């Protein structure tokens, strides 16, 4: 799977989501089904988008006791999506259980979905880390430690900000994947995101994949913005 550009399909209405995808009929898309879409449309949206041939990231960010996460991953494996995720904060035993569940649920002849762990959300800043979560280490240090823990647990990669990708690449194996949301063009509103970069910056920093939502989904001309951002992503030089 090379260098996905996942569009986050965070829509509050089935019709809006359908109209949006219809306007992209000429493009081969990678899409992300997040909590909003999944809790609204359920498994039917996964089946529909899978049958339509999209590369799928099912972003449900599991975070629970190891037994529950393992059994849930076993169920999710049957959906045959490309990427699923957990929160690294659930710890090593939980991540190992997630991987075991995913392995056990993957049907013969199918490829196991890639399993990645959210390190620190891209909406989290240093103040929140220290004052709300009571983590007294620097953001970079926390993210790299969580990435190492994910790697030790056998996971394929992490979700992080592109800012942290060079440090993760130095600390983890070459094959370890970095999926980076918090992507904006210079002209876009940042909104609730904190650790933000452009697609070109993400590529230059070494991100394996980017995740883009509102810059495209809330744009007046989503297709034009997608093409502009994809050009920036594909065209940038990796350092
Ligand atoms: O796991 C994710 O996809 C994720 C992790 C993270 O740290 N930050 C983050 O923004 N995301 C998701 O990426 C998408 C970003 O959307 P926009 O901020 O609209 O581009 C949303 O669907 C988030 O749920």
From Swiss-Prot:
Keyword terms of this UniProt record: Decarboxylase, Lyase, Pyrimidine biosynthesis
EC nos: 4.1.1.23
Physiological role: Catalyzes the decarboxylation of orotidine 5'-monophosphate (OMP) to uridine 5'-monophosphate (UMP).
Family label: Belongs to the OMP decarboxylase family. Type 1 subfamily.
Lineage: Bacteria, Bacillati, Bacillota, Bacilli, Bacillales
Organism, as annotated: Shouchella clausii (strain KSM-K16)
Binding site for substrate: 10, 32, 59-68, 122, 184, 193, 213-214
Keyword Lyase applies: yes
Coiled coil ranges: none
SMART domains: OMPdecase
GO BP: any one term: 'de novo' pyrimidine nucleobase biosynthetic process
Protein name: Orotidine 5'-phosphate decarboxylase
InterPro entries with a match to the protein in the record: Aldolase_TIM, OMPdecase, OMPdecase_AS, OMPdecase_bac, OMPdeCOase_dom, RibuloseP-bd_barrel
Taxonomic superkingdom: Bacteria
């Amino acid at each position: 799977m090379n260098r996905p550009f996942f569009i986050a399909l965070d829509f509050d209405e089935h019709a809006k989501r359908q109209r949006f995808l219809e306007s992209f009929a000429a493009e081969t898309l990678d899409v992300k089904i997040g909590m909003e879409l999944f809790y609204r449309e359920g498994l039917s949206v996964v089946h529909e988008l899978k049958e339509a041939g999209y590369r799928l990231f099912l972003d449900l960010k599991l975070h629970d006791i190891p037994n529950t996460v393992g059994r849930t991953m076993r169920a999710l494996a049957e959906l045959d999506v490309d990427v699923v995720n957990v929160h690294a904060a659930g710890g090593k035993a939980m991540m190992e259980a997630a991987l075991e569940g995913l392995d056990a649920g993957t049907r013969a002849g199918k490829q196991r979905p890639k399993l990645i762990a959210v390190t620190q959300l891209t909406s989290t800043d240093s103040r929140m880390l220290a004052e709300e979560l009571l983590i007294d280490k620097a953001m970079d240090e926390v993210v790299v430690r969580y990435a190492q823990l994910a790697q030790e647990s056998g996971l394929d990669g992490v979700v992080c900000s592109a800012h942290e990708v060079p440090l993760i690449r130095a600390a983890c194996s070459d094959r370890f994947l970095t999926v980076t949301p918090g992507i904006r063009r210079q002209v876009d509103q940042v909104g609730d995101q904190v650790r933000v970069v452009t697609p070109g910056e993400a590529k230059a920093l070494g991100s394996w994949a980017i995740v883009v939502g509102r810059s495209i989904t809330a744009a007046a001309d989503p297709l034009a913005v997608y093409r502009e951002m994809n050009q920036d992503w594909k065209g940038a030089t990796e350092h």
